[in-house]
């Protein structure tokens, strides 16, 4: 069933964190995460980055570019990785509309950049120069061009598209709208029914709480807590993960439950509300109108999604 390979390699359960070509959802997630970490509430700057309008002389932009090229696998181990760029191109060459000779030329140009010092400025300067000389090409190779992205989503329903939350996307795979167990999940965050094992595997990976190799990512869980202005529960999360007795066959569900029990339902659901709303559009935090956490707005939006799910 196609749904079971949601998010490409993520749900397929890749057994290492070695880089592999990324689908448009993965790219969009990493792009937005880097923007959140570096835009410093400069919403005008974030708008420029979304359009790949990258200024060579701007310090924030330089460190954003470093974050982005590392997250997308273009730069690793103190060097640009032309083979990774070529692999990304090959994975979607029937969709990206880029000539292979052009892709190879750009990959090779990036490979020549001397950025061994790992500094933001060294990485960004060369990258921006190559990108500016080949406007729009890397956006197509990395599936950020809207026409390329939309075509891939249309052909690959196993990939979560923009506009649907991670919990609705996973819920539709394993439950029927209005189903009692599903409504229990939506209202309380957990269910003992067998379907929840698969559902939590989907959501936990989609939230990036679980890595491709099956390990839990403590930093991703804490990121969600901090996003809802809860900064005093880091140790609770750490202890919940350390003390969790998870079984291989239900690993995601078991860790999910350990975190749930550690934080308590109220706080856990507060975090999930935010993640659900943000997951519909990864640029949610980058818009001034929705940049500040508003618990009431989150709850109102999630209630609307509950109604959509007939819960």
From Swiss-Prot:
Residues 1-16 form the signal peptide. Belongs to the PBP/GOBP family. The lineage of its organism: Eukaryota, Metazoa, Ecdysozoa, Arthropoda, Hexapoda. It holds the Pfam family PBP_GOBP. Disulfide bonds join 34-67, 63-120, 170-202, 183-311, 244-258. Its main location: secreted. ADP binds at residues 146, 149, 153, 160, 281-283. It comes from the Eukaryota. PANTHER family: GEO07291P1-RELATED (PTHR11857:SF43), ODORANT BINDING PROTEIN-RELATED (PTHR11857). SUPFAM superfamilies: Insect pheromone/odorant-binding proteins. It is found in: Secreted. The gene is D7L1. The keyword Disulfide bond applies. The amount of D7L1 in the salivary glands of 5-day-old Culex quinquefasciatus is approximately 31 ng. During the blood meal, mosquito injects approximately 7 ng of D7L1 into the host. One of its GO terms (biological process) is sensory perception of smell. This is Long form salivary protein D7L1. Keywords: Allergen, ATP-binding, Disulfide bond, Hemostasis impairing toxin, Nucleotide-binding, Platelet aggregation inhibiting toxin, Secreted, Signal, Toxin. One of its GO terms (molecular function) is toxin activity. InterPro entries: PBP/GOBP (IPR006170), PBP_GOBP_sf (IPR036728). The keyword Lyase does not apply. Modulates blood feeding of female mosquitoes on vertebrate species by binding and sequestering different mediators involved in the host response. Binds adenine, adenosine, AMP, ADP and ATP, with the highest affinity to ATP and ADP. Inhibits agonist-induced platelet aggregation and hemostasis. Distal lateral and medial lobes of female mosquito salivary gland (at protein level). Expressed in the head and thorax of the female mosquitoes, where the salivary glands are located. Expressed in salivary gland. Not detected in the female mosquito abdomen. Not detected in the male mosquito tissues.
């Amino acid at each position: 069933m196609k749904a079971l390979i949601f998010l490409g390699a993520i749900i397929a359960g890749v057994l290492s964190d070695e880089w592999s070509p990324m689908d448009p959802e993965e790219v969009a997630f990493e792009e937005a995460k880097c923007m959140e970490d570096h835009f410093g509430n400069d919403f005008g700057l974030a708008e420029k980055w979304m359009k790949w309008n990258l200024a060579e002389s701007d310090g924030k932009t330089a460190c954003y570019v470093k974050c982005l090229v590392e997250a997308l696998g273009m730069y690793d181990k103190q060097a640009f990785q032309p083979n990774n760029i070529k692999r990304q191109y090959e994975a979607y060459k029937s969709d990206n509309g880029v000539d292979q000779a052009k892709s190879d030329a750009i990959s090779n140009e990036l490979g020549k950049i001397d950025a061994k010092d790992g500094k933001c400025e060294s990485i960004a300067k060369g990258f921006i120069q190559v990108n500016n000389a080949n406007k729009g090409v890397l956006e197509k190779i990395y599936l950020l061009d809207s026409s390329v992205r939309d075509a891939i989503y249309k052909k690959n329903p196993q990939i979560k598209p923009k506009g649907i939350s991670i919990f609705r996307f996973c819920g539709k795979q394993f439950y029927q709208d209005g189903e009692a167990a599903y409504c229990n999940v939506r209202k309380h965050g957990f269910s003992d029914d067998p379907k929840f094992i698969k559902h939590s595997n989907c959501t936990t990976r989609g939230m990036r709480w679980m890595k491709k190799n099956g390990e839990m990512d403590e930093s991703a869980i804490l990121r969600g807590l901090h996003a809802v202005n809860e900064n005093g529960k880091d140790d609770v999360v750490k202890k919940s993960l350390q003390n969790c007795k998870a079984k291989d066959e239900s690993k995601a569900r078991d860790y999910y439950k350990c975190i749930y029990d550690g934080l308590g339902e109220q706080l856990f659901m507060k975090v999930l509300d935010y993640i659900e709303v943000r997951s519909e559009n990864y640029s949610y935090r980058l818009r001034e109108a929705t940049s500040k956490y508003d618990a009431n707005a989150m709850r109102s939006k999630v209630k609307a999604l509950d109604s959509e799910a007939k819960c």
